[in-house]
């Protein structure tokens, strides 16, 4: 019988070799992917808008038109968590409620609520630097920079003035420069012993002094519970004294005012204390 050729087979215990062309194709694909892998980066973490800040003064009214609110002070601990400082207390705000101001963070896109303008009787909502303390006494118990107000000290609330939204002394800038201002800083000397500016601090609303966007926003004293303001935040003397004694410029203190609904919406993105704690 003729001998038939035996088919070429690999031994059963040896794996089949890949075809040379297929092997080269996979190597080329892997090499082509290397630049893409090298260029891939982990998305950066969302920056903390309050980075560096270790003290917060938080004011939360119920709504935009509410004239009363609760204030809670907060200190950031070594682990980065906000811890309440003392008990929350009642404060009064603008006679017309509050409105978005010009602070350290932009007004959120599509945010509800009014915008602050001069003379609207609304306190400013947002996050603001806490500026200089001021008062009638030569000095106070506070580490904050302090301005001892004089009879001719004014905050300029005239939008057309080049000194708009600035604390000045008439004997320095001239009497004509303070003409028209309705904010003498020695209210006691101009209005029969008025105590409201006896102690307080500047809330740095509209630091670029954009004309008409609100000026001379302070935290100051109130003469009686429930007394509203022209746009400031007012409290009892003992509460103001505790705040001023606690605040330090090294902690980069910030003032936060947000109605409850906005606070709930923004507290995570802005790294604020939880609302249920902020309003106790």
Where does each model-flagged region fall?
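Bacterial N-terminal signal peptides that target proteins for export
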Residues: 4-27
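Cell wall/extracellular polymer interaction/catalysis modules
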Residues: 41-230, 238-280
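A conserved hydrophobic position in a structured secondary element of the catalytic/binding core
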Residues: 235
């Amino acid at each position: 019988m003729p001998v038939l050729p035996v088919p070429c087979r690999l031994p059963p215990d040896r794996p089949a070799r890949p075809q040379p062309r297929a092997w080269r194709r996979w190597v080329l694909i892997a090499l082509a992917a290397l630049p893409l892998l090298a260029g891939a980066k982990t998305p950066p973490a969302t920056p903390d808008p309050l980075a560096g800040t270790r003290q917060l003064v938080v004011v939360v009214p119920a709504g935009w038109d509410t004239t009363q609110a609760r204030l809670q002070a907060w200190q950031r601990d070594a682990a980065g968590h906000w811890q309440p400082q003392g008990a929350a207390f009642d404060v009064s705000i603008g006679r017309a409620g509050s409105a978005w101001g010009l602070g350290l963070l932009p007004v959120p896109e599509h945010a509800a609520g009014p915008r602050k303008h001069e003379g609207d009787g609304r306190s400013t909502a947002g996050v603001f630097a806490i500026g200089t303390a001021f008062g009638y006494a030569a000095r106070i118990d506070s580490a904050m920079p302090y301005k001892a107000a004089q009879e001719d000290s004014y905050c300029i609330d005239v939008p057309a003035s080049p000194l708009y939204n600035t604390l000045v002394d008439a004997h320095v800038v001239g009497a004509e420069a303070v003409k028209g201002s309705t904010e003498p800083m020695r209210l006691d000397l101009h209005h029969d012993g008025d105590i409201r500016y006896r102690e307080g601090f500047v809330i740095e609303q509209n630091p670029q002094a954009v004309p008409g966007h609100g000026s001379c926003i302070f935290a100051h004293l109130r003469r009686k519970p429930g007394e509203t303001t022209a746009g400031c935040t007012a409290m009892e003397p003992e509460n103001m004294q505790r705040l001023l004694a606690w605040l330090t410029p090294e902690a980069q203190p910030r003032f936060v005012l947000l109605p409850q609904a906005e606070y709930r919406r923004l507290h995570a993105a802005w790294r604020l204390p939880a609302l249920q704690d902020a309003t106790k």
